[in-house]
Structures are given as structure tokens and as C-alpha cells.
Amino acid sequence: MAKAVWNGQTLAESETFETVEGNIYFPDESVKREFFRSSSTTSSCPWKGQARYYTVFVDGQENPDAAWYYPDPKPAARAVKHHIAFWRGVEVTP
């Protein structure tokens, strides 16, 4: 089971996930949305497409752009559609 934890709070947990370039992507339904707020940050990957970000909020602390997703991934990255990945201090274990 994969798990994402930040500031002592489980943000996502799932037995099913996708691993791309060493990052674990959690299915949307496994993510605790109450800890996420949309960010205006975007980035672009030549083979995955345009990423969007979430800022994570736990116990009054924020972790800007700590989660990302591809709302409309390119065909080669179709497996990560409806999935979210983490970085910036979020501990992810497979």
C-alpha cells in the first residue's frame, strides 16, 4: 500500500497507484481533498503535458505546490490521468 504523509497527516493512501519516473501517482479517490487548495502554478513536461499544482494545508501550516497532477496528459502518460503525485517534503512510501 502506498501512502503520502506530511506534517503527521496522511494525505493519500492506496493499494493501487502508478509509478512514473520514480514518482508515485495516487488515484484521485484516495486523496483527502480537505488538505488541498488549487495553486496557480503550472509546469510543462514534453511527454506528459501540462501539470497543475495543489498547495497542501495541515494544522495551520502550508506546503506550497507540494502536489501535482496532469488534467489532460499526453497519450504516453495516459496512466496518470486522475492521479496526484507529491514532493517538497511529503513523505511517500510504496
Question: Which residues make up each language-model segment?
Answer:
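Terminal leader/tail segments of proteins
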Residues: 1-94
